[in-house]
């Protein structure tokens, strides 16, 4: 067998070499012996190595060296593999290879395997037979004849002669050949498991030749055998050659190609003389070793290939009789016949080799044989496909072509697979480790190990099966999960669609319902006028001229809206052009080498460090519209003075072109677009002729057409698609031309999901941004405007890549709430809360300049004050919270924002409804869009007098007014979004409000009656030195005093002090149950609050007055209720912490005490579900805002609002007035009227009328015996008030509800109601068991005698007071009730920033008091001294007795000796100098830097102190001993050591000063001990003298000893009351012990 080349591939097959050395597929020289690995050699004698007498030639018989022939074979093989058989060079090389033989041109001899090859190509020739992989259409295919030396065909050449010519004499004799053949046949039969016949056994042993062999022998020529014959005998193989060795196996006898015909009787296949079809004969090379030619045997019958296309490895040969006979193949006529194999006859008898034991089958050889068979079949199939006839059907030819191309791609596919396998090969220990078998001997496998191996294999199979099942299960689970997700997704989409459909249907239903109501209203109006016989009004509605008038009005309105539409379009175009220009400019700046400076508003370069003080500010003349710019315009620093000198001018809003471009660029743009049409700004200035509605120019058809168009367009909704569907480019569609659908919030927003209406609001805000517009988000309070703003910012940051900076301007009270919402919803947004002291704000400047922030939160004041810092930043967006503050166009905030700040995008947030006052509305629109809404006068003039052009003076009727209002709303619609709670009420829990009437205590009734009748407040007479006898005090602002009495009578200082003395309390403060017994509202709270706490309801308690909140705190402390307080004095940084503490889920505080004005704005207190309004506000919107702190988005529980109202009091009238105002506001807003003109003067007149008529009602009801009073019986309602609102309430409404009714109001469900009833029962039982039981409200028998006065007595006291006033002895001090602000807003802000508010207020107060004392000393020097003393002393004590933190009273002076020692010690410490340098150590300790200069010191040091403060305390007698002084000095040194680093100069100086103080004190104390008793007596005298001096300073008169002792005893019992204000003597750095000592008074120290 020959080893064929790899078909269509170049890789030789590995395998053991058949010879002594490696050999290529076609060996280049003769082998010295038979193939040792051949199966044939195992069955017969094998010749030994060649003798020395036969040298190995180095050159082929044709004259070609073997090396040259081998080098020629390589390119031939590569050309053959690459399919280059048609190349002429390939034919030339092939011809040279064919001539290497007995004549020139024959190639090298084949290997021993090639002797047996019956289906594989040689390297030189073409296909040897039909199964050759080389295509038959190659250059060597076709009919070829044996050629002679000259290349001529040898037609008559004898095959045997050719064999003899080509082969040398064989070294085997005849017997050896017979024996070899017998051995081969026996091996084949044994391989098939067949028994050996006897004659074959004899022939194998060489005893007797096989039958038939003798007859065949003489016919064989002795010299050689054909190269293509299936010679099975082992011959001398070719010599060793370079290249890899062929496989170590030999093909069994009879294994030819798959399509080879069976041989005939003579051993030659029929129809094949000597050569198989498809290729020329492959002769053996002729050489000197003539005896090395191998004998051949008769070829056996062929085994046909298996029909499955997958041949079995090495099928066994069958005997000639048993082998199947294949039909002979027809041979082309041009092919020469193959000569019969010749067996050479040798005379010399060789030595018989003994039979070796045959080796077993090698599985590697079987696999290789299988591969070779497959390759042979593939090659044969390729040949068949190439030789298909041309008459084949089209589809068959297509299939054949596909198959042929696929087979030709086999090697490429195999090579690709090998490369992939090499790349994907996994590293294993078996491949990378050393060969273990080379280092140890093989172990004999035992049965146990085989079983273990079998067991492991079984386990491995089970594990593989388990993994396969698991993987399959996971795959199935993933499919099921995907199906589930798929269904869920589509279910959610379907749900969203259904919700949207429902919302659309609801919207259309609501719209249809409203339209129906409107039609009914118009119909009713017509019927009403008809029934009232108002013929003129009825004709107005139905007359044709009315329609013409309406048509004219609509036409004029449409023209105005069209003008606005054009302005909007031009505004958007200008914005787009500006963006392009900015990009172009930016690109140009990037290409430029240097950086150009920024351009200021006047087109000049603007330095970064400039304060814009020398820049001109553009101004505009209000009436003419003339604009001054450049050098004509005033400078920024002289703007205010210039505006005063030039009335009629105002600051022009910054246009967009000024923000980024210069004047030169604007001129270039004007040159590029010289013919751009200027839009008409005002509809009244249109040149278009508008027909007179009274003339006949307007036909009925035209009027009807105009009306129809207006009807289609009058209800223009927020949908752009609807307008486009009607074919109208509507106003809203133009404004919101660019649409972007927003379905979800930004990923930057966490910790919550927006509601659906909030998503719609976000989409509207994004639409404003996309269309370069600004707008107003005017959702009702509590619907989440803050959250929607944060959503807009995060959406722009994520989707639009706009990271800011965003400027948000908010009130100071809501700044902390904004910061809290940002931290909660968008923690990734970098925000800056720009507030605090100037030093704190300056700390933000580096961050602002670097731009490392997204959002800046600040207040209105800092926007104005720090405009030199904040105006330098180019803001992307400006957002103004509580935007209704901008309604005044001339306010400073609006002017500063328009003049100094650059923000192309602006957004206003407001929760209050927009008032329909046209100037205010225009101011907002002008601030947002100055290019669209330019002139206020025209705007107001047109909407107020639309018929001014026609000369008519007729007022608009109702239908025309509604039309204009709708047109006005349409103007606003693209820029305004407002949703009410009722529109989203499905997402909010219910809110129920109850008004709970409260009764008055006897004390309240008495005080209220006298204050209402005479405007006086009863006193105990102590202010006139008539203590206990009673008196009166006339107070201003009677309504405020009545409200105080209704809230709590202890809000009057002297009432509480007198009652505390009457009830036996010390200190002038009433405690305990008498706190709530004195007020009906407090008594009601005492019943309600325990129930709410028991059921875990959190409460918001809103009050109008902070002094009332202080009394409330005392009550909460008495009942043990945990509470929080927030009012106007609460610092902004503390508010956020209070909100967070109250809103925590497990918070122990269930009451939040808030003032309505400070705590009712912008706070989120949704954890509370009960709102108690202790006293109603004049402005009903304030109370609504307070309610919205709890009733807002996020509230889960039902909200109960309890409004407390004292029965038959001024509070009922205030509540009625507030309700009336709220109703009027609703009517105005709904109807759109523009005549809402109420003033504070009218309100005061209205209240005065209330009080006057209430007094008459009170007297009349008292005379008739009725206890209820109502002013509405006789008081006519003020102008415009609906009389129905002021009808007297029913008797049931005046009744105070009982416990069961109150429980029904506050209970959410039946279980709570039952619990409340049981709590009331337990409370009543506990009160009944108390032996000292008192009624829950004070009764008249508990009141002191001085307060129970009849009207005549009160009248007499009032007259006496008036007489005293006339004679200059008025006892009422205006300082008691001071409603004026002692500081201006600017001073107050400055004091807040520097932290010196209390000191400044005290200074102002002292200045006022000093001026007053000066006036008193000038005017009242003739008054008696005794009464003046007592009155002044009482007033002094009363002045200090107010609620709040008690201040330090003026202490009694220290002994002069002690003061002297303290001063001496401190002076010695201060004057101490360093001995080495002469430096005064205390220089830096004398006075600390201020908080403004060194804020970090005050953050670290809790109690700062310096020598200046120590000296001041010595002067004020704060130190009672040297130990107190030592504490402060040591504290001073410790503060220095805490703040400064160890080892620093100040640190070391403080240590030295400590030792100096200690040594000086010891020295002075030793000197003090040496003094005698005489000095002590002198000290006592001096002390008494100093005391008397201090007393004389107080009362201006020196008192006697007895009076002085009594006064001192009285002062020792007196405690400062609740409401006294702090004085600057008590500082924040005082210790708690010192403050407690200050509170305790001066009684014990004065002795």
From Swiss-Prot:
E.C. number(s) listed in UniProt: 3.6.4.-
Domain QLQ residue range list: 171-206
Location of the Helicase C-terminal domain: 1084-1246
Segments of skewed composition (Acidic residues): 658-673, 1284-1299, 1567-1587, 1627-1637
Ranges annotated as biased composition (Pro residues): 1-23, 231-249, 259-286, 302-327
Effect caused by changing residue 1578 to K: In OTSC12; likely pathogenic; CRISP-Cas9 transgenic mice carrying this variant exhibit marked hearing impairment, with a highly irregular structure of the incus bone in the auditory bullae, causing disruption in the ossicular chain
Gene Ontology molecular function: any one: chromatin binding
Main location as per UniProt: nucleus
Key words, A-Z: Acetylation, Activator, Bromodomain, Chromatin regulator, Deafness, Disease variant, Hydrolase, Intellectual disability, Isopeptide bond, Neurogenesis, Nucleus, Phosphoprotein, Repressor, RNA-binding, Transcription, Transcription regulation, Ubl conjugation
Phosphothreonine modifications at: 11, 353, 609, 1423
Reaction catalysis annotation: ATP + H2O = ADP + phosphate + H(+)
Bias (Basic residues): 579-588, 1611-1621
GO (cellular component) term, any one: nucleus
Origin: domain of life: Eukaryota
Region of interest: Sufficient for interaction with DLX1: 837-916, 1247-1446
Tissue specificity statement from the Swiss-Prot or TrEMBL entry: Colocalizes with ZEB1 in E-cadherin-negative cells from established lines, and stroma of normal colon as well as in de-differentiated epithelial cells at the invasion front of colorectal carcinomas (at protein level).
Family as reported in the entry's similarity comment: Belongs to the SNF2/RAD54 helicase family.
Subunit field text: Component of the multiprotein chromatin-remodeling complexes SWI/SNF: SWI/SNF-A (BAF), SWI/SNF-B (PBAF) and related complexes. The canonical complex contains a catalytic subunit (either SMARCA4/BRG1/BAF190A or SMARCA2/BRM/BAF190B) and at least SMARCE1, ACTL6A/BAF53, SMARCC1/BAF155, SMARCC2/BAF170, and SMARCB1/SNF5/BAF47. Other subunits specific to each of the complexes may also be present permitting several possible developmental- and tissue-specific combinations.
Function: ATPase involved in transcriptional activation and repression of select genes by chromatin remodeling (alteration of DNA-nucleosome topology). Component of SWI/SNF chromatin remodeling complexes that carry out key enzymatic activities, changing chromatin structure by altering DNA-histone contacts within a nucleosome in an ATP-dependent manner. Component of the CREST-BRG1 complex, a multiprotein complex that regulates promoter activation by orchestrating the calcium-dependent release of a repressor complex and the recruitment of an activator complex.
Record-given protein name: SWI/SNF-related matrix-associated actin-dependent regulator of chromatin subfamily A member 4
Organism: Homo sapiens (Human)
């Amino acid at each position: 067998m020959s080893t064929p080349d790899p078909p269509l591939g170049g890789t030789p097959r590995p395998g053991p070499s058949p010879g002594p050395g490696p050999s290529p597929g076609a060996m280049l020289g003769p082998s010295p012996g038979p193939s040792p690995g051949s199966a044939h050699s195992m069955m017969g004698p094998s010749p030994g190595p060649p003798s020395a007498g036969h040298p190995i030639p180095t050159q082929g018989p044709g004259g070609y060296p073997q090396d040259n022939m081998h080098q020629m074979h390589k390119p031939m093989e590569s050309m053959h593999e690459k399919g280059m058989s048609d190349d002429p060079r390939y034919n030339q090389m092939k011809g040279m290879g064919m001539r290497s033989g007995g004549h020139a041109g024959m190639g090298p001899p084949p290997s021993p395997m090639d002797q047996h090859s019956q289906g594989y190509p040689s390297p030189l020739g073409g296909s040897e037979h039909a199964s050759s992989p080389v295509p038959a259409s190659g250059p060597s295919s076709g009919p070829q004849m044996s050629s002679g030396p000259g290349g001529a065909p040898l037609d008559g050449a004898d095959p045997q002669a050719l064999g003899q010519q080509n082969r040398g004499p064989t070294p085997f004799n005849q017997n050896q050949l017979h024996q070899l053949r017998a051995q081969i046949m026996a091996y084949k039969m044994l391989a098939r498991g067949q028994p050996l016949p006897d004659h074959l056994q004899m022939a194998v042993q060489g005893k007797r030749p096989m039958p038939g062999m003798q007859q065949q022998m003489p016919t064989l020529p002795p010299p050689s055998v054909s190269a293509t014959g299936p010679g099975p005998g082992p011959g001398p193989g070719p010599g060793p050659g370079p290249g890899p060795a062929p496989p170590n196996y030999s093909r069994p006898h009879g294994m030819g190609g798959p399509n080879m015909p069976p041989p005939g009787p003579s051993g030659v296949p029929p129809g094949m003389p000597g050569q198989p079809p498809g290729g020329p004969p492959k002769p053996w090379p002729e050489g000197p070793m003539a005896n090395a030619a191998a004998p051949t045997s008769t070829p056996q019958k062929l085994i046909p290939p298996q029909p499955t296309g997958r041949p079995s490895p090495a099928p066994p040969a069958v005997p000639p009789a048993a082998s199947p006979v294949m039909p002979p193949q027809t041979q082309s006529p041009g092919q020469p016949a193959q000569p019969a194999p010749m067996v050479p006859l040798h005379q010399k008898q060789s030595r018989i080799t003994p039979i070796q034991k045959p080796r077993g089958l090698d599985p590697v050889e079987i696999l290789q044989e299988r591969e070779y068979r497959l390759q042979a079949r593939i090659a044969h199939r390729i040949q068949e496909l190439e030789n298909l006839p041309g008459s084949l059907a089209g589809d068959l030819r297509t299939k054949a072509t596909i198959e042929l191309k696929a087979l030709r791609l086999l090697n490429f596919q195999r090579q690709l697979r090998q490369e992939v396998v090499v790349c994907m090969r996994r590293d294993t220990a078996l491949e990378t480790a050393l060969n273990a078998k080379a280092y140890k001997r093989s172990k004999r496998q035992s049965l146990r190990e085989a079983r273990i191996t079998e067991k492991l294999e079984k386990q491995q199979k089970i594990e593989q099966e388990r993994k396969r099942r698991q993987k399959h299960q996971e795959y199935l689970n993933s499919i099921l999960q995907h199906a589930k997700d798929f269904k869920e997704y589509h279910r959610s989409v379907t749900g969203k669609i259904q919700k949207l459909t429902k919302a659309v249907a609801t919207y259309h239903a609501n719209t249809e319902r409203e339209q129906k109501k409107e039609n009914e209203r118009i119909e009713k109006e017509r019927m009403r006028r008809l029934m009232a016989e108002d013929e003129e009004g009825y004709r107005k509605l139905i007359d044709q001229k009315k329609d013409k008038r309406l048509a004219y009005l609509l036409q004029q309105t449409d023209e105005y809206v069209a003008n606005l539409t054009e302005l909007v379009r031009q505004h958007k175009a200008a914005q787009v052009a500006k963006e392009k220009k900015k990009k172009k400019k930016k690109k140009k700046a990037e290409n430029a080498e240097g950086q150009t400076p920024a351009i200021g508003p006047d087109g000049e370069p603007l330095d970064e460090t400039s304060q814009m003080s020398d820049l001109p500010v553009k101004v505009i003349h209000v009436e003419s519209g003339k604009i001054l710019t450049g050098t004509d315009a005033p400078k920024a620093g002289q703007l205010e003075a210039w505006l005063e000198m030039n009335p009629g001018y105002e600051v022009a809003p910054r246009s967009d072109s000024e923000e980024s471009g210069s004047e030169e660029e604007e001129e270039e743009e004007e040159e590029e677009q010289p013919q751009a049409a200027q839009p008409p700004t005002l509809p009244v200035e249109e040149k278009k002729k508008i027909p007179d509605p009274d003339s006949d120019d307007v036909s009925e058809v035209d009027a009807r057409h105009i009306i129809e168009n207006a009807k289609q367009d009058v209800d223009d909704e927020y949908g752009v698609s609807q307008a486009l569907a009607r074919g109208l480019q509507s106003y809203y569609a133009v404004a919101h031309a660019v649409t972007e659908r927003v379905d979800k919030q930004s990923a930057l927003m966490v910790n919550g999901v927006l509601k659906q209406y909030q998503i719609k609001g976000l989409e509207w805000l994004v639409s404003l941004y996309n269309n370069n517009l600004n707008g107003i988000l005017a959702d009702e309070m509590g619907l989440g405007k803050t959250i929607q703003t944060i959503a807009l910012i995060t959406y722009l940051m994520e989707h639009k890549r706009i990271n800011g900076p965003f400027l948000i301007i908010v009130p100071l009270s809501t700044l902390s709430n904004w910061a809290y919402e940002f931290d909660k919803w968008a923690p990734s947004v970098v925000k800056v809360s720009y507030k605090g002291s100037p030093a704190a704000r300056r700390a933000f400047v580096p961050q602002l300049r670097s731009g490392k922030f997204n959002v800046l939160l600040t207040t209105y004041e800092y926007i104005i004050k720090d405009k030199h810092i904040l105006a330098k930043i180019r803001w992307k967006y400006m957002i103004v919270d509580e935007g209704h503050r901008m309604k005044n166009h001339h306010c400073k905030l609006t002017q500063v924002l328009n003049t100094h700040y650059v923000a192309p995008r602006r957004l206003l947030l407001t929760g209050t409804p927009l008032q329909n006052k046209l100037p205010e509305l225009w101011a907002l629109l002008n601030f947002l869009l100055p290019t669209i809404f330019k002139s206020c006068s025209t705007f107001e003039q047109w909407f107020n007098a639309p018929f001014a052009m026609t000369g008519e003076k007729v007022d608009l009727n109702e239908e025309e007014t509604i039309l204009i209002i709708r047109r006005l709303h349409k103007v606003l619609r693209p820029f305004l979004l407002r949703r009410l709670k009722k529109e989203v009420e499905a997402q909010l829990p219910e809110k129920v409000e109850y008004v709970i009437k409260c009764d008055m205590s006897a004390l309240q009734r008495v005080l209220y009656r006298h204050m209402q009748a005479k405007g006086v407040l009863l006193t105990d007479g102590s202010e006139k030195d008539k203590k206990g006898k009673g008196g009166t005090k006339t107070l201003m602002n009677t309504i405020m005093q009545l409200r105080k009495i209704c809230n709590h009578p202890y809000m009057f200082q002297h009432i509480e002090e007198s009652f505390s003395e009457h009830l036996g309390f010390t200190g002038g403060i009433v405690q305990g149950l008498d706190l709530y017994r004195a007020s009906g509202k407090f008594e009601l709270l005492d019943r309600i609050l325990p129930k709410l706490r028991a059921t875990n309801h959190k409460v918001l308690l809103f009050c109008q007055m902070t002094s009332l909140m202080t009394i409330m705190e005392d009550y909460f402390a008495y009942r043990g209720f945990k509470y929080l307080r927030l009012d106007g004095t609460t610092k902004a940084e503390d508010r956020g912490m209070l909100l967070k503490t109250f809103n925590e889920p497990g918070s122990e505080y269930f009451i939040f005490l808030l003032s309505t004005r400070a705590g009712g704005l912008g706070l989120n207190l949704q954890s509370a579900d009960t709102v108690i309004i202790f006293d109603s506000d004049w402005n009903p919107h304030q109370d609504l805002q307070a309610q919205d702190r709890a009733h807002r988005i996020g509230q889960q529980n039902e909200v109960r609002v309890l409004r407390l109202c004292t029965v038959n009091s001024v509070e009922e009238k205030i509540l009625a007035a507030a309700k009336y105002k709220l109703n009027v506001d609703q009517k105005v807003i709904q109807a759109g009227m523009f005549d809402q003109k109420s003033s504070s003067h009218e309100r005061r007149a209205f209240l005065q009328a209330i009080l006057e008529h209430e007094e008459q009602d009170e007297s009349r009801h008292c005379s008739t015996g009725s206890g209820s009073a109502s002013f509405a019986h006789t008081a006519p309602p003020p102008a415009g008030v609906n009389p129905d609102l002021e009808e007297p309430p029913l008797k049931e409404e005046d009744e105070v509800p009982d416990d069961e009714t109150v429980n029904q109001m506050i209970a959410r469900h039946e279980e709570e109601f039952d619990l409340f009833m049981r709590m009331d029962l337990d409370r009543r039982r506990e009160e009944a068991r108390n032996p000292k039981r008192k009624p829950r409200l004070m009764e008249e028998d508990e009141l002191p005698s001085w307060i129970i006065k009849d009207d005549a007595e009160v009248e007499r006291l009032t007259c006496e007071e008036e007489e005293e006033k006339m004679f200059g002895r008025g006892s009422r001090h205006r300082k008691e009730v001071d409603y004026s602000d002692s500081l201006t807003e600017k001073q107050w802000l400055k004091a807040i920033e520097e932290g010196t508010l209390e000191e400044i207020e005290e200074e102002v107060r002292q200045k006022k008091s000093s001026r007053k004392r000066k006036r008193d000393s000038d005017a009242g020097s003739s008054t008696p001294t005794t009464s003046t003393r007592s009155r002044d002393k009482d007033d002094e004590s009363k002045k200090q007795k107010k609620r709040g933190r008690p201040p330090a009273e003026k202490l009694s002076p220290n002994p002069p000796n002690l003061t002297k020692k303290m001063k001496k010690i401190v002076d010695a410490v201060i004057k101490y100098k360093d001995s080495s340098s002469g430096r005064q150590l205390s220089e830096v300790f004398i006075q600390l830097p201020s908080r403004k200069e060194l804020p970090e010191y005050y953050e670290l040091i809790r109690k700062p102190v310096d020598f200046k403060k120590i000296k001041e305390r010595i002067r004020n007698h704060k130190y009672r001993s040297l130990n107190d002084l030592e504490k402060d000095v040591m504290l001073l040194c410790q503060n220095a050591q805490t703040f400064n680093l160890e080892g620093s100069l100040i640190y070391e100086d403080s240590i030295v000063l400590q030792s100096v103080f200690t040594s000086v004190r010891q020295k002075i104390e030793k000197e003090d001990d040496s003094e005698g008793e005489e000095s002590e007596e002198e000290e006592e005298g001096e002390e008494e003298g100093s005391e008397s001096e201090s007393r004389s300073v107080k009362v201006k008169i020196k008192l006697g000893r007895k009076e002085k002792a009594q006064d001192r005893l009285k002062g020792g019992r007196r405690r400062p009351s609740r409401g006294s204000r702090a004085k600057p003597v008590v500082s924040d750095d005082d210790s708690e012990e010192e403050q407690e000592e200050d509170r305790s008074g001066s009684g014990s120290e004065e002795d």
